[in-house]
Every structure is written in C-alpha cells, then in structure tokens.
Amino acid sequence: GSVVASYPYDDSPTHRLTGVYSKSADDEVFKYLAKAYASHHPIMRTGKPNCPGEEAETFPDGITNGAQWYDVEGGMQDYNYVWANCFEITLELSCCKYPPTSELPKEWENNRESLLAFIEKV
C-alpha cells in the first residue's frame, strides 16, 4: 500500500516495471480528478507517504500515473477506461492494506474532505 491517487494508464507499451509515463487521451482530466482528492488529504497532498520500507518514495502533488509508478498489465482501471469509458482513479489510502479497526476513525478523518471534494468534481 501507499498513500497516493493513481490514474491511467497503469499499463505501458514497453511493459517496463516502472518509470514509464503512459499518457491517456484524457490525461489532464485524470490529473485534475486525482489532484482534487489528493489536495484535501493531509498525508497524500504532501507527496510523502513515508511507508515502512519505502520511505524514499514520493509522489508530486500526491498523485501518479499508474505505469510511471509500476506497470500493471490487464488491470481494471485501464480496462474500465478503454472498454466502458469509465473515468476511474485508484486511491491508495494507507501504507497498510488492512489497517487495524482502531485506526479506522483516523482514516475516515483523513479521507472525508477528499471524498467530498472528489464527489463534487465528478
């Protein structure tokens, strides 16, 4: 996990593991939506999730193009965009995939304003 808003494409023509910006035709719209979420999140907006073992990982403005972060061939985000015209972003909300129940109220507070801002945009 991490704390970042990721947008298409997750796959790239070269299928390199990381570092390839795979721009969609709607790249500016996706960046706008990802920033709408990230800019209201207290951790995501810093671009420094500081996840254990990945402390050096950073995301400018708290967002990333999926394939630039890591290549995912055949992912749902790309499939939905290409085949269903669904503008989908992926939200990584925690360094921990399954945070303990005791942390859920804090996670809600971290994400509430982001979620409302995102809903207003879409």
What is each stretch, according to the model?
Residues 1-122:
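Metallocarboxypeptidase
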